[in-house]
């Protein structure tokens, strides 16, 4: 009887040691992994950073998932990612919720971007003011003949509501940066799941207009020059104009971490802000941080 008890105790002790060893391996593995979630605008850039970083840091894993800035923020708040990549600032309500969950969001500007407004290559429009853009996307202007004399009902393309690009465009174009304004996208606007989907539709549809980060610009479509008003010069998005805050629809691209970055997350963030990391920004057609 005592021998059976002794054998059972030995077996139990062995099992506990194996479990502890497994937990230790998981813990070690976790320290070698960084989970990034969020902005569709930033996903290709972050994947390029991750690939470059892992070449010089063997044994590490940087996992990048899109889904929109809102998805990244939700994941950061619920502690299911290490970094939320976003193309807009976190809202006060989101920061408050994060703090309730014991998460202190720390803002890290990692690149700059200009929102390009694009139309089909066959469209004769060359430039628009911010006010004209607002009238187009709120539905006040419905036909291209009101702008260029060419008949054609405007097809509005927008990102989905959980997209930071959607939120930024609404706040800074439709609402002209006025926090008290209530202007919304026209209910006729087609909400597409990615910037690439907007690019593809604009390329095919002669009456379409859409917006996306400048990293998605392609020769297959026309980028409209944007002016602050009808008395101001119009500009297309360009690196030097965005760094000098001259292009009217410029924004920072941000990575939020849980408190100050630490461990592998800190090492990865330091790489991003290094000359090597900022060269990746340039190669991906975004704008390096000055």
How should these model regions be labeled?
Residues 1-33:
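Short, low-complexity disordered leader/linker segments with a strong preference
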């Amino acid at each position: 009887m005592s021998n059976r008890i002794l054998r059972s105790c030995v077996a139990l002790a062995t099992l506990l040691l194996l479990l502890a060893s497994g937990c230790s391996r998981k813990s070690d593995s976790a320290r070698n992994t960084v989970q990034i979630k969020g902005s569709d605008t930033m996903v290709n850039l972050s994947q390029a950073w991750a690939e470059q970083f892992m070449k010089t840091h063997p044994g590490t894993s940087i996992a990048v998932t899109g889904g929109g800035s809102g998805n990244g923020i939700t994941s950061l708040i619920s502690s299911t990612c290490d970094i939320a990549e976003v193309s807009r600032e976190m809202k006060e309500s989101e920061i408050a919720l994060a703090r309730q969950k014991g998460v202190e969001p720390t803002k890290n500007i990692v690149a700059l971007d200009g929102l390009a407004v694009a139309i089909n290559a066959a469209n004769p429009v060359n430039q628009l003011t911010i006010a004209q853009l607002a009238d187009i996307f709120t539905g006040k202007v419905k036909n291209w003949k009101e702008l260029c004399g060419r008949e054609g009902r405007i097809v509005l393309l927008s990102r989905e509501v959980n997209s930071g690009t959607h939120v930024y465009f609404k706040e800074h174009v439709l609402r002209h940066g006025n926090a008290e304004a209530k202007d919304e996208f026209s209910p006729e606007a087609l909400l597409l799941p990615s910037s690439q989907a907007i690019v593809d539709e604009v390329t095919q549809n002669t009456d379409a207009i859409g917006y996306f980060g400048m990293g998605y610009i392609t020769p297959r479509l026309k980028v409209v020059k944007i002016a602050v008003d009808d008395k101001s010069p119009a500009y297309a998005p360009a690196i030097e104009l965005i760094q000098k805050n001259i292009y009217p629809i410029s924004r920072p691209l941000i990575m939020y971490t849980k408190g100050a970055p630490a461990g592998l997350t800190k090492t990865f963030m330091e790489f991003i802000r290094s000359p090597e990391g900022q060269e990746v920004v340039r190669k991906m057609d975004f704008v390096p941080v000055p």
